[in-house]
């Protein structure tokens, strides 16, 4: 079981996803899951993530229900006892998850 669930709400943020997901991919601590909650994006965010980061669990909402709903959906799906919330335009250092 993962120790940490990282939740990333997203709406039309494909331009930012490479930064946040690549920085998570480089984490020294590996016992975490990543959940991208997509708020009905029309910019290819979901396809980009599926094609480049197959380890990311994606929750697709049919419309833009807003930040709070996306966060809540991610928390409901989280399988770890600890949750980290990241904006889609965040890039983290390689020890971020471990230090948290």
Go through the PLM ranges and name each one.
Residues 44, 90-100:
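Acidic donor-binding/catalytic loop of UDP-sugar-dependent glycosyltransferases
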Residues 22-31:
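Short, acidic, metal-binding catalytic loop of nucleotide-sugar glycosyltransferases
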Residues 2-5, 33:
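Cell-envelope/extracellular polymer assembly enzymes that use nucleotide-activated donors
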Residues 31-40, 59-61:
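Short beta-strand/loop segment that forms part of the nucleotide-sugar
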Residues 23, 38-47, 63:
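A conserved acidic beta->alpha catalytic loop
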Residues 61-78, 88:
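Glycine-rich, basic loop-to-helix element that forms the pyrophosphate-binding segment
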Residues 83:
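Short aromatic/hydrophobic "clamp" motif used to bind/position activated sugar donors
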Residues 24, 49, 74, 96-100:
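A short, amphipathic alpha-helix embedded in the catalytic core of nucleotide-handling enzymes
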